[in-house]
Amino acid sequence: MLKPLGNRVIIQKSEQEQTTKSGIVLTDSAKEKSNEGTIIAVGAGRILKDGSRVAPEVNEGDKVVFQQYAGTEVKRGDETYLIVNEEDILAIIES
């Protein structure tokens, strides 16, 4: 398993639809890059100049929206994860 450092989080991206509403199957190049996912791991938080640590605002299990081209994709087995800085998370999706 991956453990993020500092103010980073690990996100499992939500799958995009494979077809349009009218039934057209999308190719990989035609799909929009997903910017939603579920947080699966959270780092310890950002360290300030005075040495104190700011706790993360997000938690494991939160569904979030993040910046379109943020982070680094990492493959582990069959799964692909995204490691992003907490600042790149735009919102928590509340159900």
UniProtKB/Swiss-Prot annotation:
GO molecular function ontology, one term from the record: ATP binding
Record has Cytoplasm as a keyword: yes
Coiled coil: none
Subcellular localization(s) per the UniProt record: Cytoplasm
Keywords: Chaperone, Cytoplasm
Signal peptide stretch: none
InterPro entries referenced in this protein's UniProt entry, alphabetically: Chaperonin_GroES (IPR020818), Chaperonin_GroES_sf (IPR037124), Chaprnonin_Cpn10_CS (IPR018369), GroES-like_sf (IPR011032)
GO biological processes: chaperone cofactor-dependent protein refolding
Family designation: Belongs to the GroES chaperonin family.
Name this polypeptide is given: Co-chaperonin GroES
Lineage, top ranks: Bacteria, Bacillati, Bacillota, Bacilli, Bacillales
